[in-house]
Regions:
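Conserved phosphate/ATP/ADP-binding segment of small-molecule kinases
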Residues: 207-212, 218-289
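Conserved phosphate-binding/catalytic region of the ribokinase-like
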Residues: 32, 38-50, 58-65, 69-70, ...
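Extreme N-terminal basic, low-complexity initiation segments
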Residues: 1-9
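Glycine-rich phosphate/adenosyl-contacting loop at the front of the ribokinase-like
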Residues: 33-111
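Conserved phosphate-binding/catalytic loop of the ribokinase/pfkB sugar-kinase fold
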Residues: 137-139, 150-193
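Hydrophobic beta-strand scaffold residues
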Residues: 110, 136, 213-214, 270
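Substrate-binding N-lobe of the ribokinase-like
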Residues: 75-147, 352-358
Length: 360
């Protein structure tokens, strides 16, 4: 059942029909040319994942559970020294990088634009992207690359302390029109809104060159801190808008099922993820819900990033909005079953078969 966007629709009354049903509704779903290439623009950060034995330790080190705090190099070192007894893993990260890696595993042609240092972390980061079949478009500068310390509570919630390093300092003229012309969709990380000239210029350039612009709001603190700027840029440039429940509430002041309707009036399609309840998608006078997949989360790190990958992959192959969201839900269901933002290599053949079933 489809619903008029101008009416309030309680979440309990939103239903997602079968994929077959939505295949018959392609005229509602913004079907686009197949085999679109997607490039991401985001903070290039090495993820250091720490599995906390108890969440009380967060207050001891002065970080609020669930927050994303910016830290300097000295704070980063102090936090990691305090948590030396916690199990840890390391992997190239940053929200958009996670999304581009997942897109490449699905078979999409994906690229990533970021800024790194001339250190070992930067070299490792670039090599890891190449191995994942993501085209790296890096701007290099002297000094240390950025990193994100991800502290995972026993209930799976993530708390982040981020040392950005050079990651957010990309200048507008460091992204050429020649690079952008090689792609059809650009996916921009909301965290980069701190660099207004970069985001504004890149969005304007992309639209002028005919690219679709996708934006992830990234964090409710980002929305609260840059709301006037977002209210200007989103209606003007953004086609596809991703947010979670708290980010949508920060932007609109509304609960999720109302927020998605309000957001859809500003963009081509709005997606609000709502955790274990799934996601809400609104576009072109319609609103519908997609069920969540996966069991009890071990770690929610990367759930939104992988959802975005699934959705954008669907769009790159001409799927409907609903099919795209179902692919996103599938990827989210897999990544919450592991520690870290990346799905294990061994799971991708199984995922690819599920994606084929959704599309067919």
């Amino acid at each position: 059942m489809f619903f008029n966007l101008d009416k309030h629709v309680p979440l309990s009354k939103l239903h997602c029909k079968s994929t077959g049903y939505f295949r018959n509704m392609q005229y509602l779903c913004g079907k686009i040319e197949k085999k679109m290439k997607i490039v991401g623009l985001g903070n290039a950060l090495m993820d250091v994942l720490l599995q906390l034995k108890q969440e009380e330790i967060l207050s001891e080190i002065g970080i609020q559970k669930g927050a994303m705090d910016m830290i300097n190099r000295e704070q980063m070192i102090a936090i990691r020294q305090r948590l030396t007894d916690c199990p840890r893993t390391q992997a190239p990260g940053g929200s958009v990088c996670n999304t581009m890696r997942a897109l490449a595993y699905l078979g999409a042609e994906a690229g990533f634009i970021g800024k790194i240092g001339t250190d070992a972390i930067g070299a490792y980061y670039e090599e890891a992207l190449r191995k994942a079949h993501v085209h790296p478009h890096f701007i290099r500068t002297t000094g240390e690359s950025g990193s994100c310390t991800v502290m995972i509570s026993p209930d799976g919630e993530r708390t982040m302390g981020t040392f950005l390093g050079p990651a957010p300092t990309i200048a507008p003229d460091e992204i050429s029109e020649e690079l952008l012309r090689d792609y059809h969709i650009i996916y921009i990380e909301g965290y980069l809104i701190v660099n207004e000239p970069l985001v504004r210029t890149t969005m304007e350039k992309a639209k002028r060159l005919g690219l679709k612009v996708a934006l992830d709001l990234s964090n409710f603190n980002i929305v609260n801190g840059f709301k006037p700027l977002l209210e200007e840029l989103i209606p003007r440039y953004v086609d596809i808008l991703f947010s979670n429940e708290s980010e949508a509430a920060a932007y609109t002041g509304l609960p999720a099922e109302e927020a998605v309707l309000a957001l859809a009036k500003q963009v081509e399609v709005a997606i609000v993820t709502i955790g274990k309840r799934g996601s809400l998608v609104a576009s072109a006078g319609t609103c519908y819900a997609i069920a969540a997949e996966g069991g009890k989360p071990i770690d929610t790190t990367g759930a939104g990033d992988n959802f975005a990958a699934g959705f954008l992959y669907g769009q790159s192959v001409g799927a409907s909005w609903a099919q795209s969201a179902q692919i996103g839900s599938t990827l989210s269901g897999y990544v919450i079953d592991v520690v870290g933002p990346q799905i294990p290599d061994a799971k991708w053949p199984e995922i690819q078969e599920k994606v084929k079933a959704i599309l067919n």
